[in-house]
From Swiss-Prot:
The lineage of its organism: Bacteria, Pseudomonadati, Pseudomonadota, Gammaproteobacteria, Enterobacterales. Keywords: Cytoplasm, Elongation factor, GTP-binding, Nucleotide-binding, Protein biosynthesis. The gene is fusA. This is Elongation factor G. Belongs to the TRAFAC class translation factor GTPase superfamily. Classic translation factor GTPase family. EF-G/EF-2 subfamily. GO terms for cellular component: cytoplasm. Its main location: cytoplasm. Residues 8-290 form the tr-type G domain. The keyword Methyltransferase does not apply.
Length: 702
């Protein structure tokens, strides 16, 4: 099969936004205008096409990032058909893993902002993730028809809050109920969409008289921003020459691809205005797979030799699995992005991360929750495979004769845990299977069995994250579970350096004895660094080399469950510098036990402390409740970092220990009569005050 769409006409984009910016509605409209969807789904009545899990439709928030393919030839059919692969990303902070994961496989992004709420806390998180992966982006300021909508205010917030360089491509004509269309600042024409056909057709008109001055001012700004792309254009512009429409567009595109500017469009997805022009901007300004740098990886040659793959059908096949989803009819769906080469259904490829072969049984192109079976995929494609056996998020699938490992994704450590048990004993096995499958889909979710209590413990990124996991067990696997109280993931560490601490394990009672003797130093390491280091400074063979790994292992086993309260130990180094052994009685086990004794003793002497997770909390509240909100955060041991005005009141930024934040959503609702909202994400570990640490240690000791 030959390629049907040249790779230069591909756009792999993500649509990212804060929870209520109207992202799903925007995606729906894209699907409608690109002719995929014949009836527009509304989130309000739970019918949106992209939100395909039952819970998403109930909660009205997007949880799973679904991938969809659509074609667009421009509002005025001015382009050849372009293929747009859209990844819908969740906007809730508990699902930032999904956002991170999709940013990894995108070439460009559309950031959706609410014209009333502007740049919200979650938008900043998503922005940072897009920066991390150098994703070129444009913005769409949605909900221009809502009370309090203000386009230029949001443009200013993109500058001040995100530290970006926004350049409006358009201006809104009117706002709130009077919002009727937009001014195209490149063409210097007004665009009005036809309401009778839901905005499929439009007319170019003259700019309204009362907007001419403002439009000229912003047109100048736009042209100047374009001219900054090259000295040649700058000279032309400064020399008073007019830049052609093509020159302006090419220059702006160059600057977007270099991440120097963010072009800002506007509209109201709900009122069928603006999404069409935003789609044109996606084609004109966002990158094709050939516009972005080749993907980097390492060769599987034992030396980690750097390598890369270009977006080209003729290069060896390489793809990245970025999401595993469970489908009610076909089982596991593995979403993957093809970076190079071609693969056909029925082909066998290599999972280079696990050194295992996988066969592509069937390949499907997803349209939200509908699917179309296809025979092959090529460089630049995003598709899903059915029947892959052992692929995890972040694995590389590649040509068996040209193995490469593409960059691995980094996943955050969970910060909250709860115990779960099935309501009936019969469901125990089913629950294990369900949790195993959910953990495969979501690397930020972990499952383990507590050795002491034998309870099943699930851990994740926040209360909502775990609530949804429990909910999915019930819906998708028919397992009802009882849930315990949330537990905080504390850590243990030390503050002092101690030297020459001995550990001796000696047993002489008939038969072969056991003998191991070590002397260690222990010292604190920088937080957030390596976590643990082991240095072997044994001189003159006082401990034979074959026992050294056993000493390291003995210490590492102690790190899993610290001496204070059984929490993992972090940020410390151990130096082994002396000891003794016995020709007959010494063994690896004896040295392992000696090391663990030395570790416990050294830890006790080195000023041990308990670390607790601190969350970055942002609360948006009407001004009337400001005092209550701040008072409540202070009571929760919060440290207020600052406040700023928003369109609807104030935003309070604080750092608060996670242990104090349980049930906060309910308390905040009752304090503010449901008018405030908050977002929370993990920030760092910090030393817990003595009284808190004492209470935790006592509770663990019971």
């Amino acid at each position: 099969m030959a390629r049907t769409t040249p790779i230069s006409r591909y756009r792999n984009i993500g649509i990212s936004a804060h929870i209520d910016a109207g992202k799903t509605t925007t995606t729906e409209r894209i699907l409608f205008y690109t002719g995929v969807n014949h009836k527009i789904g509304e989130v309000h009545d739970g019918a949106a096409t992209m939100d395909w899990m039952e819970q998403e439709q109930e909660r009205g928030i997007t949880i799973t990032s679904a991938a969809t393919t659509a074609f667009w030839s421009g509002m005025a059919k001015q382009f050849e058909p372009h293929r747009i692969n859209i990844i819908d990303t969740p906007g809730h902070v508990d699902f930032t893993i999904e956002v991170e994961r999709s940013m990894r496989v995108l070439d460009g992004a559309v950031m959706v902002y609410c014209a009333v709420g502007g740049v919200q806390p979650q938008s900043e998180t998503v922005w940072r993730q897009a920066n991390k992966y150098h994703v070129p982006r444009i913005a769409f300021v949605n909900k221009m028809d809502r009370m309090g909508a203000n386009f230029l205010k949001v443009v200013n917030q993109i500058k001040t809050r995100l530290g970006a360089n926004p350049v409006p491509l358009q201006l809104a004509i009117g706002a709130e109920e009077a919002f009727t269309g937009i001014v195209d600042l490149v063409k210097m024409k007004a665009i009005n969409w036809n309401e009778a056909d839901q905005g499929v057709t439009f007319t170019y008109e003259d700019i309204p008289a009362d907007m001419v001055e403002l439009a000229n001012e912003w047109h100048q700004f736009l042209v100047e921003s374009a001219a900054e792309a090259s000295e040649e254009l700058m000279d032309k512009y400064l020399g008073g020459e007019t830049l052609s429409e093509e020159e302006i567009k090419n220059a702006l595109r160059q600057r977007v691809l270099n991440n120097e500017i963010i072009l800002v469009t506007c509209g109201s997805a709900f009122k069928n205005k603006g999404v069409q022009a935003m789609l044109d901007a996606v084609i004109e300004y966002l990158p094709s797979p050939t516009d972005v740098p080749a993907i980097k990886g390492i060769l599987d040659d034992g030396k980690d030799t750097p390598a890369e793959r270009h977006s080209d059908d003729n290069e060896p096949f390489a793809a990245l699995a970025f999401k595993i989803a469970t489908d009610p009819f076909v089982g596991n769906l593995t979403f993957f992005r093809v970076y190079s080469g071609v693969v056909n259904s029925g082909d066998t490829v290599l999972n280079s991360v696990k050194s295992a072969r996988e066969r592509f049984g069937r390949i499907v192109q997803m349209h939200a929750n509908k699917r179309e079976e296809i025979k092959e995929v090529r460089a630049g494609d995003i598709a899903a495979a059915i029947g892959l056996k052992d692929v995890t998020t972040g694995d590389t699938l590649c040509d068996q004769n040209a193995p490469i490992i593409l960059e691995r994704m980094e996943f955050p450590e969970p910060v909250i845990s709860i115990a779960v048990e099935p309501k009936t004993k019969a469901d125990q096995e089913k629950m294990g299977l369900a949790l195993g499958r959910l953990a495969k889909e979501d690397p930020s979710f972990r499952v383990r069995t507590d050795e002491e209590s034998n309870q099943t413990i699930i851990s994740g990124m926040g209360e909502l994250h775990l609530e949804i996991i429990v909910d999915r067990m019930k819906r998708e696997f028919n397992v009802e579970a009882n849930v315990g109280k949330p537990q905080v993931a504390y850590r243990e560490t030390i503050r002092d350096t101690v030297k020459d601490v001995e550990g001796k394990h000696a047993k002489q009672s008939g038969g072969r004895g056991q003998y191991g003797h070590v002397v260690i130093d222990m010292f604190p390491l920088e937080p957030g660094g390596e976590g643990y280091t082991f240095t072997n400074d044994i001189k003159g063979g006082v401990i034979p080399g074959e026992y050294i790994p056993a000493v390291d292992k003995g210490i590492q086993e102690q790190l899993k469950s610290g001496p204070m309260a059984g929490y993992p130990v972090v940020d410390l180094g151990v130096r082994l510098h002396f000891g003794s052994y016995h020709d007959v009685d010494s063994s690896e086990l004896a040295f392992k036990l000696a090391a663990s004794l030395a570790f416990k003793e050294a830890f006790k002497r080195a000023k041990p402390v308990l670390l607790e997770p601190i969350m970055k909390v942002e609360v948006e509240t009407p001004e009337d409740y400001m005092g209550d909100v701040i008072g409540d955060l202070n009571r929760r041991r919060g440290m207020i970092e600052g406040m700023e005005d928003t369109a609807t009141g104030k935003t309070v930024r604080a750092q608060v220990p996670l242990s104090e934040m349980f049930g906060y959503a309910t308390d905040l609702r009752s304090q503010t009569q449901g008018r405030a909202s908050y977002s929370m994400e993990f920030l760092k570990y910090a030393e817990a005050p003595t009284n808190v640490a004492q209470a935790v240690i006592e509770a663990r000791g019971k």
